[in-house]
UniProtKB/Swiss-Prot annotation:
Name this protein carries in UniProt: NAD(P)H-quinone oxidoreductase subunit K 2
Membrane topology (UniProt): Peripheral membrane protein
InterPro entries, alphabetized: NADH_UbQ_OxRdtase-like_20kDa, NADH_UQ_OxRdtase_20Kd_su
Family: Belongs to the complex I 20 kDa subunit family.
Statement: the UniProt record of this protein carries the keyword Signal: no
Oligomer and partners: NDH-1 can be composed of about 15 different subunits; different subcomplexes with different compositions have been identified which probably have different functions.
Location, primary (coarse class): membrane
Species of the source: Synechocystis sp. (strain ATCC 27184 / PCC 6803 / Kazusa)
Broad class of enzyme this protein falls into: translocase
Cited Gene3D superfamilies: 3.40.50.12280
Amino acid sequence: MSTSTHALTLQNPIQAPQVTKELSENVILTCLDDIYNWARLSTLYPMMFGTACCFMEFMAAFGPRFDLERFGSIPRATPRQADLMITAGTITMKYAPALVQLYEQIPEPKYVIAMGACTITAGMFSADSPTAVRGVDKLIPVDVYIPGCPPRPEAVIDGIIKLRKKVAGESRQDYTEDLQTHRFHAVRHRMKPVSPILTGQYLRHHEDLTPHHDPLLIK
C-alpha cells in the first residue's frame, strides 16, 4: 500500500453509508402534507348539534359497543376546540342563526357531517312545514351525508371513515386556495341584528290594540 493510499484510509476511516434493514425499518420518508393530514384525521373532534331522535343514535355510537372514540373522535362542548360539526335532526328557522354562529366559531380547517333525513332534506317536514329548513347545506357546507331515519351507529362510523379518507387526500395548498375563494357560496354569513320578537304581543294583531268603534253608534 502506498503512502498516499494509507493517508486517505486514515483520514476517512468510515465507509460510505449503506441502507441496511435496520435503517429502513426505523426511518420513514414522507412529506409535510402527509404528516399534517395524518394528525388531523386522527384527531377529528366533533361538536354535536342534535335537535331530534337522530342524536340518540349518535350517542349510541360513543357507547362501549361501538366506541367511536377509538378513531380519535372525542366530543367537545365548545366549537373553538372542535374541527367537525355533526348535525342531527331537523333544523328550523329559529335554530338557523345559532347553527351558523357555531359553525363560524370552529377554526379552519373544519368539516360538517349531515346525519339523518331530517337534517339533509327536512325529512317528513319537507312537505308543508313553514319553519323547517330544507337541508342544512342551505346554511353551511356539508362534506359527508349519512342518510337514514335514523342512521345506525355503523353508518355513523362509516361516515367518519369516509371523512378521514377525504382528509388524507387533501393538500395544504388546496386548503389555502379554498380558504381564499370560499368553498361554498354561503360560508361567510353576516347576521343583521333585529329587534326581539319575544315581546308577548306576537299573538295579537295591531288592530286589536285600538278600541273598536261601531260607526252606527257614533253621533
